[in-house]
Structure formats: structure tokens, C-alpha cells
Design a protein with these regions (language model features):
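N-terminal positively charged helical leader segments and presequences
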Residues: 1-71
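Structural motif
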Residues: 2-3, 37, 62-63, 79-81, ...
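Hydrophobic side chains in well-ordered alpha-helices
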Residues: 26, 91-94, 208
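Short secondary-structure boundary segments
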Residues: 42, 110-111, 176-179, 200, ...
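RNA substrate-binding interface of SAM-dependent RNA methyltransferases
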Residues: 72-173
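Active-site/ligand-binding-proximal alpha/beta "capping" segment
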Residues: 164, 169-208, 217-220
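Structured adenosyl-cofactor binding patch, chiefly the S-adenosyl-L-methionine
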Residues: 206-251
Length: 251
């Protein structure tokens, strides 16, 4: 945890009182004392610092801080991801990783090679996935929570929803081991938002690939090696970010 994240509702008259895992981290990991300063931010809001004003003694685990939010949140990420629903244990890892690396929206959809039981994992009950996104933000010192949208049927997603949003993207990429293009060729030279589609463990089936390419998605391969979904998401995000940064600097 590199930043303590709070909600607007937790701040009262410039003060916040913590009595959960965040307080435990301040006490046990940071070993902070009264008067020490820690990074703090409001989810989907400003960042700044918190000065510790009180640390509970005895059986009290409470930590109180005076909050000074003097920094604007980082700009919104310009990468969104379409993800065929993976196994729950892998989805948890991916949620944390994409929040840490920075995405705007995660579109989670069904696919031919996705087991229907994956939707019953409980992660989507009462937004149970939020804690995993939060862990990624805490790692990256960010406050902007990615949006998550779920689609339990593939065809309504790709035929009805997706055509309504594609105009908002400068580049659209579908990761496919037999794609004919390289990642660098799929990214347009002009800056803008990018939409990346990553399939399930068994990959997208031909019908799904055709649906994406009919919407002007560029099918790209990331090399000869077949990667697990969580590895592919991180590698592709990093590759896109590196290519765009190199172009931005004119190298």
C-alpha cells in the first residue's frame, strides 16, 4: 500500500478516522507515529497527505489523520480493455494489475470458451471486485477507479453495444495468436484512446474474431509464445504504453 485511499464520506471537517486494514498498515507496516505524514487520496478525487494526529493505544486500533488534498488526480488513462471472463482466481489478479497499470474501463464479456459458472463466483455481487481494483490503485498511487461493465452474452455485446462506442477510439486491437499484424502496426500514429480485446484461455473462436475485425479491430500477435490471460493483459498493456511513449518522444 503506497497510498491510503478514503472516500469523501469518511472525511469529516478535514479529518479522517481509520479502524481497518488501512490503520493496521499505518501501524504495523509503516510503523508511523503521531506527526508523521502519509500519502492519502480520495477515490475518484484529489490526492495529498495526511498528518497522523492520533494513534489508538491498548485495545484501540484507530488511527486519525488531518487531511490536506492539494493535488489533482492523475489524467484518466487512455487504454480500455475488453476481457473475456477468466477463472475467478485469475480475474482477481487481473483486476489488481490493470488498476495498477491504468485503464479507464474494463468491459468483461462472455465468450464461447468461457465457462458459464465463472459468472457465479460472487465477484459481481455488490461490486465484490472493487477491493481488487483498490489494491491496484494503492500500489500505483492513483485515485481514479476504473469502471467495470459486464456483459453475460457475447452477441449483444459485440453487435449492439460495441458499435455504439467504437467511434471514441483511435485504435482498436484484438489479441489473437494467429493475427497477421504486429502490435506496433496496429497502433495508429496519432494519439488517442485505445481499446484492447483479450480472449479466454482457449482464445477467441473464429466467429468472435470475425465480429471484432468487422468493427475495424486489428488482429495482432504478440509473438510465438502462448501466454496465460493475466500475463497477456499485462504484456500487451505495457507494449502499447511503451510504443505510444516512444512515439510521443519522437524516438
Amino acid at each position: 500500500m503506497n497510498i491510503v485511499l478514503v472516500t469523501d464520506e469518511e472525511i469529516r471537517e478535514g479529518q479522517v478516522a481509520l479502524d481497518d486494514h488501512r490503520a493496521a498498515h499505518i501501524r504495523r507496516v509503516l510503523r508511523a507515529s503521531v506527526g508523521d505524514r502519509v500519502l492519502i487520496g480520495v477515490i475518484n478525487g484529489r490526492r495529498g497527505s495526511g498528518i497522523i494526529t492520533e494513534i489508538g493505544k491498548g485495545t484501540s486500533t484507530q488511527v486519525c489523520l488531518r487531511v490536506d488534498l492539494d493535488q489533482e488526480p492523475v489524467p484518466p488513462p487512455d487504454i480500455d480493455i475488453i476481457l473475456a471472463l477468466p477463472r475467478p482466481i485469475m480475474l482477481r489478479r487481473i483486476l489488481t494489475q490493470v488498476a495498477a497499470m491504468g485503464i479507464g474501463t474494463l468491459f468483461i464479456t462472455h465468450a464461447n470458451r468461457v465457462e458459464k459458472s465463472f459468472w457465479d463466483s460472487g465477484l459481481f455481487d455488490d461490486q465484490g471486485y472493487v477491493d481488487f481494483l483498490r489494491q491496484g490503485l494503492e500500489q500505483a498511487i492513483d485515485t481514479r477507479m476504473p469502471e467495470v461493465q459486464t456483459f453475460r452474452r457475447f452477441r449483444p455485446f459485440v453487435e449492439d453495444f460495441l458499435p455504439q462506442v467504437t467511434d471514441g477510439y483511435q485504435g482498436m486491437i484484438i489479441a489473437h495468436p494467429y493475427g497477421g499484424a504486429h502490435l506496433v502496426d496496429c497502433l495508429p500514429p496519432a494519439p488517442g484512446r485505445v481499446l484492447l480485446a483479450v480472449g479466454p484461455e482457449g482464445g477467441w473462436v473464429d466467429f468472435e474474431v470475425e465480429k471484432f475485425t468487422s468493427l475495424r479491430f486489428c488482429a495482432c500477435s504478440f509473438g510465438e509464445r502462448i501466454l496465460k490471460v493475466d500475463t497477456a493483459v499485462v504484456a500487451l498493456h505495457a507494449g502499447i504504453s511503451a510504443i505510444r511513449e516512444t512515439r510521443r518522444q519522437g524516438r
